Structure formats: C-alpha cells, structure tokens
Amino acid sequence: MGNSFTNVVVFSGFYLPGYKGGGPIKTIKNLFDETGKDINYKLITSDRDLGDKVPYTNIRFNEWNKLGNANVFYIQPGLKGYKQILQLLSCKDYDLIYLNSFFSLRFSFFPLIIAKLLHKKIILGPRGEFSTGALSLKSFKKYLFIRMQPKLNLQN
C-alpha cells in the first residue's frame, strides 16, 4: 500500500467493548480490520458505552489497550478527559487525525482545534451528519458548530 500516512489517530465517541453506539463502532472496527496491517491506528474514545454512567470494567485505564489491529485509549469524562486528549495529541507520534464525527465537542471540535494548532492533517468522516434529517435533530447545537468552524479558521 503506497500510503504516506502510516500512523493515524482516530477519534470516535464510542467503541468496543461497547455496542450502543451502533453503526460507527462497526465502521471503525471494519476500517481497522481491513487496513490495520498497513496503518498503525490509535483510537481515542470514551471509557463507557452510550448512555452508561459507569466505565467499562474490562479495560486498562490511562494507557493504550491493544484491541484487534488498533491501540485504544479510553478517556474519562469531564475535564480530565480533555486533558488526556491534549496530552495524547501533544505527543505528535502520528501523521494524520481522523475524526469520525463533526458534532462532538470532545471527539471532534476539541481535537480539531488542537490539530490545527499543531499543524496536523485531518480527515473528517461525518457519516451522514449533514443530511437534512440529521441536521434537524439538536439543530441549535449543530448550527453553532457549523458557524464556529470557519470563524476559527478550522477548515484548512
């Protein structure tokens, strides 16, 4: 594979062992399964499943967990999670950042700002989030995200 991006950090709100996040979990797992032998993936995700109040019990916290063809870091909620993201992205041991969503403050907007400050390349995979139906749900929040992006010069 003639890819110059061999080390990729992926952000997704939910991942295995969770299942409540549905399709995005399967999409990211399939990406890792199909291309993980050629690309070194590091996934940053939540330490709990969608809607759960307690973290997973079968993961190691504050360190990378090998899961299939990727290393996964499960971040904690609140300010501690933002600090963890900042520390992980500051390491700069990656070529590219892949954001699996656009409308997540923790897993898209914040990493996008940090990546811009660090001059890192970014790929956005919004997975249908800009469809008319999707935009009508929680529309005020999405309107703010869309309006803030060009004002912060985050599009390049």
Tell where the protein language model's regions lie, with residue ranges:
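Nucleotide-activated donor-dependent transferases that construct or modify glycoconjugates
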Residues: N3-G21, I25, R127
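Active-site proximal beta-strand in glycosyltransferases
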Residues: V8, L96, L112-T132
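N-terminal strand-loop element at the rim of the active site
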Residues: F14-G18, E34-L79
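A short, histidine- and acid-enriched strand-loop-helix "catalytic/donor-clamping" loop
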Residues: L16-P17, L105-R106, I122-F140
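Short amphipathic alpha-helix
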Residues: G22-T35, Q149
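Short N-terminal targeting/anchoring amphipathic segment
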Residues: Q87-F107, L118-I123
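Membrane-proximal helix-turn-helix segments that form the acceptor-binding/catalytic region
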Residues: L117, K142-N156
